[in-house]
């Protein structure tokens, strides 16, 4: 990585309302990019978060958790309006969770904190979820990808949420524009099913690998993950676990994938095209992190020690 070695994550931060009983919800800090930043911090990666955060009680909690996880929140904008909300319907390892978002008139709605010259302060930029294609936030994310230059790398996770993104015909070109610019891309088989109905997800993922990224990774829930690069395909199964909650599992996978890449010198200045051995190692690490997250309630990404213990390397 470049001299500062920072991974900058940009996107939404919100509060997940997760059902605990029929009429009881628990407020849990979340948002896909936010979870990814927290996960990176817990894995020991120097991380910054560029998001729009409220000054209300929940916004203060979001900032506090970033700090506790070793993430620099100084790239973010603080807004006096309330924190955005997401009502979560729990899923299984096969189906994943479902979300209903409440974003209007909240801190989410406003100018992007992501500046075009971000590469002067960070080695790698990760963008993701609906904020990467939504209005002014999405436009800023696209400009940021375009401005990466030769000394920085980028990654993108579309994390499609059908009930918050525009119709497919409008969303697909925006997603593909970002795929073409990103160094690395991660998406789920559900993302591909929604974006390309009737096309096998593996075929769509292989097609993305030909659009420009060095690597495309597709997660398949309880079936593991696949990687596409240099015309090759690597398949890595997931371990058998007792699933408690799938919320945040994909974000834990993303953060662990980036952490493993950083360790192998695949982020920032001097980043190289990955080898088959490296990609296999990255998938194992990311799948282990996601599996740990599925064994506990809420988006709770693991620490490096927890992942190492599962892999037998700690």
Spans of features found by a protein language model:
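Proline-centered loop/turn at the N-terminus of a beta-strand
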Residues: 6, 46, 153, 184, ...
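Conserved N-terminal subdomain of the carbohydrate kinase-like
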Residues: 46-129, 154, 311-314
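Short beta-strand scaffold segments in enzyme catalytic cores
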Residues: 38, 85-89, 224-228
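Conserved beta-alpha-beta core of the PfkB/ribokinase-like small-molecule kinase fold
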Residues: 124, 129-206, 223-225
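Glycine-rich phosphate/adenosyl-contacting loop at the front of the ribokinase-like
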Residues: 1-71
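General beta-strand structural signal in soluble alpha/beta enzymes
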Residues: 9, 75, 154-156, 186-187, ...
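Short glycine-enriched, charge-decorated loop/helix-capping segments at active-site entrances
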Residues: 22-27, 104, 272-273
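Conserved phosphate-binding/catalytic region of the ribokinase-like
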Residues: 1-6, 197-314
């Amino acid at each position: 990585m470049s001299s500062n070695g920072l991974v900058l994550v940009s996107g939404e931060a919100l509060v997940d309302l997760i059902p605990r009983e029929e009429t009881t919800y628990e407020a849990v800090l979340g948002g896909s990019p936010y979870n990814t930043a927290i996960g990176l911090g817990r894995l020991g990666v120097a991380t910054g978060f560029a998001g729009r955060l409220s000054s209300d009680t929940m916004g203060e909690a979001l900032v506090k958790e970033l700090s506790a996880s070793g993430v620099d929140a100084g790239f973010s904008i603080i807004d006096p309006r309330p924190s955005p909300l997401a009502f979560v319907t729990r899923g299984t390892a096969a189906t994943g969770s479902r979300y209903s978002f409440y974003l209007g008139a909240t801190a989410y709605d406003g100018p992007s904190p992501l500046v075009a010259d971000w590469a002067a302060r960070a080695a790698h930029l990760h963008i993701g979820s609906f904020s990467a294609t939504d209005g002014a936030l999405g436009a800023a994310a696209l400009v940021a990808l375009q401005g990466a230059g030769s000394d920085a790398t980028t990654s993108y996770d579309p994390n499609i949420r059908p009930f918050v993104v525009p119709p497919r015909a409008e969303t697909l070109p925006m997603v593909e524009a970002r795929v073409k610019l990103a160094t690395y891309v991660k998406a789920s088989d559900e993302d591909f099913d929604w974006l390309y109905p009737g096309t096998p997800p593996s075929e769509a993922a292989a097609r993305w690998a030909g659009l420009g990224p060095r690597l495309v990774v597709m997660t398949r829930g309880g079936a593991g993950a696949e990687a596409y690069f240099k015309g090759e395909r690597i398949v890595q199964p997931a371990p058998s676990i007792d699933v408690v909650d799938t919320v945040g599992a994909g974000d834990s996978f993303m953060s662990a994938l980036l952490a493993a890449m950083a360790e192998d010198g695949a982020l920032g200045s001097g980043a190289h095209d990955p080898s088959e051995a490296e990609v296999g190692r990255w998938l194992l690490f990311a799948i282990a992190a996601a599996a740990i997250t599925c064994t506990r309630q809420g988006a709770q990404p693991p620490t490096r020690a927890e992942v190492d213990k599962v892999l037998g390397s700690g």
